């Protein structure tokens, strides 16, 4: 099944003529660390930005401590809560941020030492916090800073210090990180796995006990490195540097792009060499990917955009509400 192309001009590049009543205020400069904003990520109802000096601030709905303010208050909905009034995220002395990914009830950040730290709902954090069961990290006094444990299995202070994280993506309730040991890339995923979105051959929640492996078994592609990871609501996609991609997890609407609606990654014998690559249009490769709620899109090497999965509300941009 070849994936349907959606016009990038219609979806992304059309210049709309807004009236003054629609945009009656000039955008305000967001103050973060006396510098500009370099990275932003949006969760379900909270947002995080990293500035060019590699410091971070988060705001929005604060349940489960996901904004890292050591409380559950919302920030950004009242006066004197943004700019200089908004606290910086603290993950430990001397540590700065290189990437951030926000989910529904948690936030994860890639740290400058190659580790990942997460806060929010405990069972999603992939760290010792998960072993405490229900509850949250970041919603109470002295729960941030150096007290936040690292995600297990990679990073300089882990039991596998040779593996360092180089990118991260968070879905609704799971997270994945591309890791590297200076010779090859690997993938680690943790959180809820009810649809196989972790790619670990089960539907278990992973990372909430000390003995669970987060190592995702990907096909042996002859040393081709990993370029990008994108976690959707209940599926995950990975892009290799040669432009091939693969997806696993929930597939009720065909969002995995494999010509069927069979879920992948929730049972044995579905990952590794058995993992199917996405059926991109003939002769095309992908340069960037994005996984959403039951849908996936890829920018192709010819500049076109391919989207597939759930067509509800016209989200695929194919002038139809049909699944693709």
Give the residues covered by each predicted segment.
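Surface loop/turn motifs at the tips and blade-to-blade linkers of beta-strand repeat domains
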Residues: 32, 89-92, 218-221, 279-281
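Sec-dependent, cleavable N-terminal signal peptides
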Residues: 1-29
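Short glycine/serine- and acidic-residue-enriched loop/turn motifs that recur at repeat junctions
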Residues: 15-19, 59-82, 119-145, 188-211, ...
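Beta-rich catalytic cores
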Residues: 36, 43-44, 96, 103-104, ...
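Conserved core positions of repeat-based scaffolds
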Residues: 46-49, 58, 106-109, 118, ...
């Amino acid at each position: 099944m070849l994936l349907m192309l959606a016009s990038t001009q219609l979806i992304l590049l059309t210049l709309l003529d807004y009236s003054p009543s629609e945009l009656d205020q000039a955008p305000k400069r967001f103050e973060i660390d006396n510098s500009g904003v370099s990275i932003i990520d949006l969760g379900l109802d909270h947002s995080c930005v990293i500035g060019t000096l590699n410091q971070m601030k988060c705001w929005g709905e604060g349940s489960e401590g996901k904004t890292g303010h050591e409380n559950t208050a919302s920030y950004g909905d009242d006066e004197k809560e943004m700019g200089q009034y908004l606290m910086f995220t603290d993950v430990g002395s001397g540590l700065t941020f290189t990437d951030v990914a926000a989910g529904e009830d948690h936030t994860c950040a890639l740290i400058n030492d190659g580790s990942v730290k997460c806060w929010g709902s405990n069972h999603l954090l992939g760290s010792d916090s998960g072993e405490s069961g229900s509850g949250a990290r970041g919603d109470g006094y002295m729960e941030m800073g150096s007290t936040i444990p690292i995600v297990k299995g990679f990073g300089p202070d882990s039991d596998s210090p040779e593996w360092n994280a180089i990118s991260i993506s968070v879905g609704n309730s799971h997270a994945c990180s591309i890791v590297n040991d200076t010779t090859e890339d690997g993938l680690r995923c943790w959180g809820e796995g009810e649809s196989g979105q972790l790619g670990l051959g089960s539907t278990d929640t992973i990372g909430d006990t000390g003995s669970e492996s987060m190592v995702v078994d990907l096909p042996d592609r002859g040393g081709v490195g990993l370029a990008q990871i994108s976690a959707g609501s209940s599926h995950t996609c990975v892009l290799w540097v040669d432009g091939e991609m693969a997806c696993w997890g929930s597939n009720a609407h065909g969002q995995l792009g494999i010509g069927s609606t069979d879920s992948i990654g929730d049972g044995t014998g579905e990952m590794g060499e058995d993992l199917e690559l996405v059926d991109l249009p003939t002769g095309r490769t992908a340069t960037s990917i994005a996984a959403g709620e039951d849908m996936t899109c890829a920018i192709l090497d010819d500049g076109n955009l391919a989207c597939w999965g759930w067509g509800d509300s016209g989200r695929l941009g194919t002038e139809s509400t049909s699944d693709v």
